[in-house]
From Swiss-Prot:
GO terms for biological process: translation. This is Large ribosomal subunit protein uL4. The modification Phosphoserine is found at residues 290, 295, 362. The modification Phosphothreonine is found at residue 266. It is found in: Cytoplasm. Keywords: Acetylation, Citrullination, Cytoplasm, Isopeptide bond, Methylation, Phosphoprotein, Ribonucleoprotein, Ribosomal protein, Ubl conjugation.
Length: 422
């Protein structure tokens, strides 16, 4: 399949090249912006909505009044009267059976959206540019494997077709009938409540036929399922990008294809059929980044690449790792050895001094036969008891004063002795 050529072949009604060529319009090289297409499609689709609302009286067509507090029931308004189950039931509230909904819908909602004209034209240009790329068209599910060329252009004789069988034969000759068979196979019943709202059956989209003049082409193609017919002067983004997704399979008539440059212009010339409109330009004129980066102008400003690879090595502490310290300071090994020898020499000197001092002390006391014990205290003799030191501020237990002698108490004379004495 040929695509994006500067010259596009025009095919006859027999499905063969007629020998005529058409220059590819500049609009097919416009930037493809799916975000703009989706935004415009979403807003324009809202303009087809029909206002709806619930009745203003719904849920309030009863007499109800709150019972107030003190009855151990909710303070919601309750239906008055008696003699029926309805009396005493809650009313009016959105939480009540038979009550109104929360925030009842109104017909004065902002249903429609205004979209900038230039933005709508940008979206159409993007949709047309995407329709010329086989990858995008096939990603939408269109069966174009056997189509000879994209964009597909046919002679203007097709605009004079009045019979559906002529249109079917043309699609079969152009190898586009596989896309119609896909539509037939996709016809099914809608899931959900749309079945009750005149949207019972659904199907996939087929080719979009774009013409310049209607000489009967609408009647010829309109009864084929999936077909959409558009006038080139009234292109619709809702038809060119159904669902807001670019990549619709389009079949053009020759006169409609030639008119695109007049409608949308080129980058050298403004559009003649639209006032003061210029074709949108790419933000990046050359998308070949490797070619741009390797160009001599950019390479001249860049520094030479660093080809040496510096791998990150685990950093070790030289104060704990002798091997790393020796790499930094080879004299560290000699220093460490000298330190060890100096410590050993100092230790030996201290031990000799301690032994000499102990021996001199034992000689002064006249203790014979005892060898000086180096580094340990003398052991106590077995059986020697440690004398207790006198406690300061308290009298010792052995130095108690003897108790004073008590005088003999004189016996008092009894009453009988007193009588006898008298």
């Amino acid at each position: 399949m040929a695509c994006a050529r500067p010259l596009i072949s025009v095919y006859s009604e027999k499905g063969e090249s007629s020998g005529k060529n058409v220059t590819l319009p500049a609009v097919f090289k416009a930037p493809i912006r799916p975000d703009i297409v989706n935004f415009v499609h979403t807003n324009l689709r809202k303009n087809n909505r029909q206002p709806y609302a619930v009745s203003e009286l719904a849920g309030h067509q009863t007499s109800a009044e709150s019972w107030g507090t003190g009855r151990a029931v909710a303070r919601i308004p309750r239906v008055r009267g008696g003699g029926t189950h309805r009396s005493g039931q809650g009313a009016f509230g959105n939480m009540c059976r038979g009550g109104r909904m929360f925030a009842p819908t109104k017909t004065w909602r902002r249903w429609h959206r205004r979209v900038n004209t230039t933005q709508k034209r940008y979206a159409i240009c993007s949709a047309l540019a995407a329709s010329a790329l086989p990858a995008l068209v096939m990603s939408k599910g269109h069966r174009i494997e056997e189509v000879p060329e994209l964009p597909l252009v046919v002679e203007d004789k097709v605009e004079g077709y009045k019979k559906t069988k002529e249109a079917v034969l043309l699609l079969k000759k152009l190898k586009a009938w596989n896309d119609i068979k896909k539509v037939y196979a996709s016809q099914r019943m809608r899931a959900g409540k749309g079945k009750m709202r005149n949207r019972r059956r659904i199907q996939r989209r087929g080719p979009c036929i774009i013409y310049n003049e209607d000489n009967g082409i609408i009647k010829a193609f309109r009864n084929i399922p999936g077909i959409t017919l558009l006038n080139v002067s009234k292109l619709n983004i809702l038809k060119l990008a159904p669902g807001g997704h670019v990549g619709r399979f389009c079949i053009w008539t020759e006169s409609a294809f030639r008119k695109l440059d007049e409608l949308y212009g080129t980058w050298r010339k403004a559009a003649s059929l639209k006032s003061n409109y210029n074709l949108p330009m790419h933000k990046m004129l050359n998308t070949d980044l490797s070619r741009i980066l390797k160009s001599p102008e950019i390479q001249r400003a860049l520094r030479a690449p660093r080809k040496k690879i510096h791998r990150r090595v685990l950093k070790k502490n030289p104060l704990k790792n002798l091997r790393i310290m020796l790499k930094l300071n080879p004299y560290a090994k000699t220093m460490r050895r000298n330190t060890i020898l100096r410590q050993a020499r100092n230790h030996k000197i201290r031990m000799d001094k301690a032994a000499a001092a102990l021996e001199a002390k034992s000689d002064q006391k006249g203790v014979q036969g005892k060898k000086p014990v180096v580094g340990n205290k003398e052991k106590k003799a077995v059986g020697d008891k440690k004398l207790k030191k006198p406690v300061v501020g308290k009298k010792a237990a052995g130095t108690k004063k003897p108790a004073a002698e008590k005088k003999p108490t004189e016996k008092k004379p009894t009453s009988e002795e007193k009588k006898a004495a008298a």
